[in-house]
Design a protein with these regions (language model features):
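Surface-exposed patches in mature extracellular/periplasmic domains of secreted proteins
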Residues: 65-70, 153-157
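Serine-hydrolase catalytic machinery in alpha/beta-hydrolase-like enzymes
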Residues: 1-69, 78-86, 108
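Short beta-strand immediately N-terminal to the catalytic nucleophile in serine-hydrolase-like folds
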Residues: 70-72, 97
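Proline-centered helix-kink/hinge sites
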Residues: 20, 88, 114-116
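Structured loop/turn residues at beta-strand edges in well-structured enzyme cores
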Residues: 63-66, 89-92, 113
Protein backbone atom coordinates (compact mmCIF):
# COMPACT_ATOMS: atom_id res chain seq x y z
CA UNK A 1 0.00 0.00 0.00
CA UNK A 2 2.88 2.37 0.59
CA UNK A 3 4.07 2.14 -3.00
CA UNK A 4 0.75 3.30 -4.47
CA UNK A 5 0.91 6.90 -3.30
CA UNK A 6 -2.88 6.83 -3.02
CA UNK A 7 -2.97 8.07 0.58
CA UNK A 8 -1.45 11.46 -0.25
CA UNK A 9 -3.72 11.77 -3.30
CA UNK A 10 -6.75 10.86 -1.18
CA UNK A 11 -5.76 13.45 1.42
CA UNK A 12 -5.32 16.13 -1.24
CA UNK A 13 -8.57 15.42 -3.11
CA UNK A 14 -10.76 14.33 -0.21
CA UNK A 15 -11.62 10.71 -0.86
CA UNK A 16 -11.31 7.53 1.18
CA UNK A 17 -8.78 4.89 0.20
CA UNK A 18 -8.66 1.46 1.80
CA UNK A 19 -6.20 -1.40 1.40
CA UNK A 20 -7.97 -4.68 2.17
CA UNK A 21 -5.84 -7.80 2.25
CA UNK A 22 -6.90 -11.23 1.08
CA UNK A 23 -6.77 -14.24 3.40
CA UNK A 24 -4.11 -16.92 3.59
CA UNK A 25 -4.46 -19.68 0.98
CA UNK A 26 -3.35 -22.90 2.74
CA UNK A 27 -2.23 -24.53 -0.53
CA UNK A 28 0.40 -21.83 -1.13
CA UNK A 29 0.89 -20.17 2.26
CA UNK A 30 0.35 -16.79 0.61
CA UNK A 31 -2.42 -14.27 0.90
CA UNK A 32 -4.88 -14.28 -1.96
CA UNK A 33 -8.20 -13.11 -3.32
CA UNK A 34 -10.53 -15.95 -4.27
CA UNK A 35 -10.87 -15.43 -8.02
CA UNK A 36 -10.81 -18.99 -9.35
CA UNK A 37 -7.83 -20.31 -11.28
CA UNK A 38 -5.03 -21.20 -8.88
CA UNK A 39 -7.26 -20.16 -5.91
CA UNK A 40 -10.04 -22.72 -6.50
CA UNK A 41 -9.21 -24.49 -3.23
CA UNK A 42 -10.23 -21.33 -1.37
CA UNK A 43 -13.54 -21.23 0.47
CA UNK A 44 -13.33 -17.50 1.23
CA UNK A 45 -16.18 -15.31 -0.01
CA UNK A 46 -14.12 -12.27 -0.92
CA UNK A 47 -16.89 -10.63 -2.95
CA UNK A 48 -19.18 -10.90 0.09
CA UNK A 49 -16.43 -9.55 2.35
CA UNK A 50 -15.79 -6.52 0.13
CA UNK A 51 -19.52 -5.91 -0.19
CA UNK A 52 -19.66 -5.78 3.63
CA UNK A 53 -16.70 -3.38 3.66
CA UNK A 54 -18.63 -1.07 1.34
CA UNK A 55 -21.67 -1.29 3.65
CA UNK A 56 -19.48 -0.49 6.67
CA UNK A 57 -17.92 2.52 4.94
CA UNK A 58 -21.35 3.78 3.95
CA UNK A 59 -22.68 3.35 7.51
CA UNK A 60 -19.66 5.07 9.07
CA UNK A 61 -18.87 7.77 6.49
CA UNK A 62 -21.95 8.08 4.26
CA UNK A 63 -19.91 7.48 1.11
CA UNK A 64 -21.09 8.16 -2.43
CA UNK A 65 -22.15 4.69 -3.55
CA UNK A 66 -21.95 5.71 -7.22
CA UNK A 67 -18.22 6.40 -6.95
CA UNK A 68 -16.66 3.17 -5.76
CA UNK A 69 -13.55 2.13 -7.65
CA UNK A 70 -11.28 -0.88 -7.35
CA UNK A 71 -7.67 -1.22 -8.30
CA UNK A 72 -5.21 -3.96 -7.57
CA UNK A 73 -1.88 -5.37 -8.55
CA UNK A 74 -1.46 -8.97 -9.71
CA UNK A 75 -4.04 -11.04 -7.75
CA UNK A 76 -5.58 -7.71 -6.68
CA UNK A 77 -6.08 -6.89 -10.35
CA UNK A 78 -7.87 -10.21 -10.81
CA UNK A 79 -10.06 -9.31 -7.82
CA UNK A 80 -10.88 -5.91 -9.31
CA UNK A 81 -12.17 -7.64 -12.45
CA UNK A 82 -14.15 -10.10 -10.31
CA UNK A 83 -15.78 -7.17 -8.52
CA UNK A 84 -16.63 -5.56 -11.86
CA UNK A 85 -18.38 -8.82 -12.77
CA UNK A 86 -19.91 -10.02 -9.49
CA UNK A 87 -20.51 -6.74 -7.65
CA UNK A 88 -21.10 -4.53 -10.66
CA UNK A 89 -24.07 -2.78 -9.08
CA UNK A 90 -21.61 -1.16 -6.67
CA UNK A 91 -18.41 -0.78 -8.70
CA UNK A 92 -18.08 2.20 -11.06
CA UNK A 93 -14.71 1.35 -12.62
CA UNK A 94 -11.60 -0.78 -12.15
CA UNK A 95 -7.90 -0.66 -12.89
CA UNK A 96 -5.89 -3.87 -13.02
CA UNK A 97 -2.12 -3.63 -12.77
CA UNK A 98 -0.51 -6.87 -13.98
CA UNK A 99 -3.72 -8.80 -13.31
CA UNK A 100 -6.08 -10.59 -15.67
CA UNK A 101 -9.34 -12.52 -15.53
CA UNK A 102 -9.51 -16.20 -14.69
CA UNK A 103 -11.57 -18.53 -16.85
CA UNK A 104 -14.07 -18.80 -13.96
CA UNK A 105 -14.43 -15.02 -13.70
CA UNK A 106 -15.06 -14.65 -17.43
CA UNK A 107 -17.55 -17.52 -17.51
CA UNK A 108 -19.50 -16.10 -14.56
CA UNK A 109 -19.25 -12.45 -15.55
CA UNK A 110 -22.57 -10.66 -15.92
CA UNK A 111 -22.10 -6.95 -15.16
CA UNK A 112 -25.26 -4.89 -14.77
CA UNK A 113 -23.87 -1.83 -16.55
CA UNK A 114 -21.00 -0.68 -18.76
CA UNK A 115 -17.88 -0.48 -16.62
CA UNK A 116 -14.81 1.63 -17.27
CA UNK A 117 -11.71 -0.55 -17.33
CA UNK A 118 -8.00 0.23 -17.42
CA UNK A 119 -5.32 -2.44 -17.72
CA UNK A 120 -1.61 -1.88 -17.13
CA UNK A 121 0.50 -4.87 -18.12
CA UNK A 122 3.96 -5.62 -19.47
CA UNK A 123 4.42 -7.91 -22.45
CA UNK A 124 7.26 -9.75 -20.71
CA UNK A 125 5.54 -10.33 -17.35
CA UNK A 126 6.76 -13.76 -16.22
CA UNK A 127 4.27 -14.09 -13.33
CA UNK A 128 0.97 -13.15 -15.00
CA UNK A 129 1.61 -13.72 -18.68
CA UNK A 130 0.21 -11.11 -21.04
CA UNK A 131 -0.54 -14.01 -23.37
CA UNK A 132 -2.53 -16.04 -20.83
CA UNK A 133 -2.01 -19.47 -19.33
CA UNK A 134 -4.07 -22.30 -17.84
CA UNK A 135 -5.49 -19.95 -15.18
CA UNK A 136 -5.65 -16.61 -16.99
CA UNK A 137 -7.16 -15.20 -20.12
CA UNK A 138 -4.79 -13.37 -22.47
CA UNK A 139 -4.95 -9.62 -21.84
CA UNK A 140 -6.19 -8.90 -25.37
CA UNK A 141 -9.14 -11.28 -24.76
CA UNK A 142 -9.87 -9.54 -21.46
CA UNK A 143 -9.91 -6.17 -23.20
CA UNK A 144 -12.08 -7.57 -26.02
CA UNK A 145 -14.55 -8.86 -23.41
CA UNK A 146 -14.96 -5.39 -21.91
CA UNK A 147 -15.08 -3.65 -25.31
CA UNK A 148 -17.95 -5.98 -26.26
CA UNK A 149 -19.72 -5.69 -22.90
CA UNK A 150 -19.39 -1.90 -22.86
CA UNK A 151 -20.38 -1.66 -26.53
CA UNK A 152 -17.49 0.68 -27.26
CA UNK A 153 -14.58 0.99 -29.63
CA UNK A 154 -11.13 -0.19 -28.68
CA UNK A 155 -9.72 2.80 -30.57
CA UNK A 156 -9.09 5.95 -28.51
CA UNK A 157 -11.00 9.05 -29.53
Amino acid sequence: MNYTGFQSIADEFGFIVIYPQGTLLPATGQTHWNVGGWTTSSITDDVGFLNEVIDFLDDEYSINLKQIYSTGMSNGGYMSYKLACDLSSRIAAVVSVTGSMTVETVEGCNPSHPTSIAQIHGLEDSVVSYYGNAFSKPIEEVMDYWVDHNNCSSEPN
